[in-house]
């Protein structure tokens, strides 16, 4: 029988199958952070259980950590307690841990791939919805709840029913000035935030194959915003060369043998997909969200939509509420909308390639008056590499803040927050009401577009700026 990439990974990890179709699924890698793990470890402690495979588990701190002046420690009591609790738990249960003083520390979905902890063909889980990021390597990666975190810690398995297969094919070549972030926003704009419900999305097509690994991680990261359980890209030579030599990846002849297996994971020609969606890459332009859901997206050269043109009353009511919250008027041009804050970071867009893209815009320019701009590397390794390349100097000379790694302003769980009414151009993945701080207004876009907003003080079509390709 012809099988998809998802089918092959799933079948290889089924320990047992129950009569109702539920499977006991073996988990290769379990990633843990400070927010969703405390109750799970406490459950183990109360039951007198151990972590089944500490060697297949990695813990990091990312959500609650400060990204500036770390010498002062974590000031917010609840955040400090969560970090201290994780430190206590990993020490007690013998789980490897990248703490705040470890250069490998960072956002879990940046750290896993860059360390080679995440590998093609693996099943990977974490108590975090954006675990789908790791699917860029050709892994089946998805978020789980705290009770499931405890289950994996105790058994290295999960009870799961298989998802449906969905193929998103992006044909042709992406136009100049467009990025993976524009691609995934266009996909979500087309299928909606419920479009992938019950499915695992496999991304394919010439435009997807042309993406580097950072770009593939961006699109897989936001599969959740399309409603999918996970996102996947079949591993290829781009994947293998990117993984070669990474600390936790196989080495030498073991790596070569692994590549032979990884090549076999690609979907069979003629394999069945329950749903197929096709986009033409040539039609994708720089995108930006206007509302409070990732599906509320328009072209940067477009206008704010009119609720009166919506097809039903529920949607009209929803759109009016969003416009009121975002302080926007129907028909207004999305370009030239003033911004107060720019955030370049998050598990969606904080890798070295993202920072290079933003630095290409920032170089020789300066952050506009009245705008605060933050650049937050996704890990200590990314920060170190950026500083070796001189990207930090480009940002600092342009008036950006250069931060330590962490989730930062992606979510309001640490000191980096918006204040009510502030408008932010953000490279993160969610624009819900209050996501970046109570009353904050979020516009999702690419790193290059965010940098363009920072130096012009408004949402700007990056294609109108004269930008050098290298930094």
Swiss-Prot record:
Binds 1 [4Fe-4S] cluster per subunit. [4Fe-4S] cluster binds at residues 347, 407, 410. Pfam families: Aconitase. Belongs to the aconitase/IPM isomerase family. LeuC type 1 subfamily. Its cofactor is [4Fe-4S] cluster. PROSITE patterns: ACONITASE_1, ACONITASE_2. GO terms for molecular function: 3-isopropylmalate dehydratase activity; 4 iron, 4 sulfur cluster binding; metal ion binding. NCBIfam families: leuC, PRK05478.1, PRK12466.1. Heterodimer of LeuC and LeuD. One of its GO terms (biological process) is L-leucine biosynthetic process. This is 3-isopropylmalate dehydratase large subunit. The keyword 4Fe-4S applies. Its EC number is 4.2.1.33. It catalyses: (2R,3S)-3-isopropylmalate = (2S)-2-isopropylmalate. The keyword Nucleotidyltransferase does not apply. It comes from the Bacteria. Keywords: 4Fe-4S, Amino-acid biosynthesis, Branched-chain amino acid biosynthesis, Iron, Iron-sulfur, Leucine biosynthesis, Lyase, Metal-binding. InterPro entries: 3-IsopropMal_deHydase_lsu, Acnase/IPM_dHydase_lsu_aba_1/3, Acoase/IPM_deHydtase_lsu_aba, Aconitase_4Fe-4S_BS, Aconitase_4Fe-4S_dom, IPM_dehydratase_rel_enz, IPMI_cat. Pathway: Amino-acid biosynthesis; L-leucine biosynthesis; L-leucine from 3-methyl-2-oxobutanoate: step 2/4. Catalyzes the isomerization between 2-isopropylmalate and 3-isopropylmalate, via the formation of 2-isopropylmaleate.
